[in-house]
């Protein structure tokens, strides 16, 4: 599924920044799509020769050593939701707990809300959510297990204190 280009598109013109920006784009895309799928679509779209293993090495490697081409980076950007045109003009902010694939967010976004925090533990729901919704890396936090941000996951905290 192709999307509008992501905000970093203009930065890819600076070849010196390109490897790190492409790496960042790959990291974002890999939270949405399986590496096997990304390798397949990059190969189909750009005539690349990526495999799941070779993309995994790129993900784990140093950003400045990223070997994906600018063309690959631009295609990956097209798979990531872009910033809505009215993003800065939102009327209120909200959090999306137990988010699923974003049904509640759909309604809140429609009436002018800006999501600042999302929590979803299911891997597949989380990937679908990220594929459907723009998440600003500076304003939005994506969390998997709600217990990671509450007191209930801390062994030194009693049940009475946690609840």
Annotate each language-model stretch with its function:
Residues 2-163:
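Conserved active-site and SAM-binding loop architecture
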């Amino acid at each position: 599924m192709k999307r509008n280009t992501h905000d970093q598109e203009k930065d890819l013109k600076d070849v010196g920044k390109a490897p790190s920006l492409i790496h960042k784009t790959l990291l974002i895309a890999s939270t949405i799509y399986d590496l096997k799928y990304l390798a397949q679509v990059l190969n189909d779209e750009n005539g690349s020769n990526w495999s799941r293993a070779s993309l995994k090495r790129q993900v784990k490697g140093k950003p400045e050593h990223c070997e994906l081409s600018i063309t690959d980076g631009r295609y990956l950007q097209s798979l990531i939701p872009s910033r809505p045109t009215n993003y800065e003009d939102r009327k209120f902010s909200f959090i999306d707990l137990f988010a699923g694939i974003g049904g509640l967010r759909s309604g809140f976004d429609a009436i002018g809300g800006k999501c600042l925090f999302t929590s979803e533990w299911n891997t597949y729901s989380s990937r679908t959510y990220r594929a459907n919704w723009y998440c600003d890396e500076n304003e939005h936090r994506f969390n998997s297990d709600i217990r990671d941000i509450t007191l209930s996951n801390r062994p030194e905290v009693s049940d009475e204190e946690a609840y």
